[in-house]
Structures are given as structure tokens and as C-alpha cells.
Regions:
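Glycine-rich/acidic phosphate-handling loop/turn and adjacent ATP-lid/helix
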Residues: 175-189
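Helix-loop-beta hinge of the Bergerat
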Residues: 102-131, 187-189
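Short beta-strand-loop-beta element adjacent to the nucleotide/active-site pocket used for signaling
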Residues: 166-177
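STAS-typified acidic loop motif
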Residues: 1-24, 38-40
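Conserved ATP-binding N-box helix of the HATPase_c
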Residues: 132-165
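A glycine-rich helix N-cap at a beta->alpha junction
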Residues: 85-103
Length: 189
């Protein structure tokens, strides 16, 4: 099955609607070969790799083979820097404290220390993060960790997917830090 990725996917209603539809369209795929065609794709906001990665992970758990085709050099660079490309290729570029990316990762709830270390190094210790007190950092870390815990308790999920992006060239600068789980929804609970 060939799936065409649209020209631009952003963190807005259209972007999230696209991924919801992609999830629905592929929900019955079992042991298939899925080609994600990026020929038309010029931009996918890095933080949305958490959503896309969760969908791909679900597909792989159901025995599907995943491949990306026609990925532009620009998109390959984005996917390489945030380690998202590791899902389909064996590439591992270092992510440094100077990087604008918060690399893609998948966590299991029992990885509490890893989750906290990730948030600390990928978000709170980045040079692009505004100067804040140690107490503020501690409170932010606690609040973010609570999101992980709530997803597992209320969502009955075992995995959390994360990715993010600093947009330091915008005025004012901002960051998107995305958490995704595929557990039970608020409506279901």
C-alpha cells in the first residue's frame, strides 16, 4: 500500500486531522508492505514525529513493513537530526545541547529515570531554553512527568512517544514538545 504524505503538516487542526485519518486508514493493515511517499512533502514539523512515530510503531507491531520513499534532502535532514529516521533506517546522528531538536523517543512507563533524564537534557538544559531557576526546572519536570504517569494510569497505555522542536528564529521564540500515547481516550474513560 502506498500512502502519500501531504505537502505540509503542521501542529494545527489540519495536521492532527491528517494523522487521525492516517491512523484510521491503516488500522486494518496487518502484515502488509506500506510505502510512505514523501514526493509532495516539503515540511513536517519535527514535533509531529511523535504522532507519526506512534502510528508507525503500531503498524510495525501488527507485522507491517514500513518504508519511506522520495524523501527530500531537507526532510531527510529533519528526520535524521531528531532521530526519527531510525524507525526505518539505521542512522544515528548525535543530538547536541545546541540542537533545535528534541529527539524522537519511545518510552515505557517503567523507564522513569530515562524519561526524567530525557526531559532534563532535551528540554530544560538546552541552550535555547530561557534562563529559569532550578526550582522552576524541577516543577516543570514534575509537571511533564505527571503527563507520562497519567497516560499510563488513565489511558492504560504502555508506550509514550515524544519529539519536539525549538523555533528560535521566531519572535517570540517558542517550543513544541509533543507527547503521544495510543491508550484509552478521555471519552472512553
Amino acid at each position: 500500500m502506498k500512502l502519500t504524505i501531504p505537502k505540509s503538516i503542521k501542529s494545527n487542526l489540519l495536521g492532527y486531522t491528517y494523522f487521525a485519518q492516517l491512523y484510521a486508514d491503516t488500522s486494518s493493515c496487518i502484515a502488509e508492505s506500506l510505502l510512505f511517499d514523501f514526493n509532495e512533502c516539503e515540511w513536517l514539523e519535527g514535533n509531529l514525529c511523535a504522532v507519526f512515530g506512534g502510528i508507525l510503531n503500531d503498524l510495525q507491531h501488527r507485522g507491517n513493513a514500513i518504508a519511506f520513499i522520495n524523501v527530500s534532502d531537507r526532510m531527510r535532514g529533519v528526520f535524521s537530526r531528531n532521530r526519527f529516521l531510525n524507525i526505518v533506517e539505521s542512522i544515528n546522528l548525535p543530538n547536541t545541547i545546541q540542537s533545535t531538536t528534541i529527539y524522537y523517543n519511545r518510552f515505557f512507563i517503567e523507564e522513569e529515570k530515562d524519561i526524567k533524564r530525557y526531559v532534563q537534557s532535551e528540554l530544560l538544559d538546552k541552550r535555547l531554553m530561557p534562563e529559569i531557576s532550578d526550582l522552576a526546572k524541577k516543577k516543570i519536570l514534575e509537571a511533564i512527568f505527571e503527563i507520562f504517569v497519567n497516560a499510563t494510569i488513565h489511558g492504560k497505555t504502555s508506550e509514550i512517544f515524544t519529539c519536539g522542536q525549538f523555533f528560535d528564529r521566531h519572535k517570540p521564540p517558542y517550543v513544541y514538545f509533543t507527547f503521544v500515547d495510543f491508550g484509552r481516550s478521555i471519552r472512553t474513560n
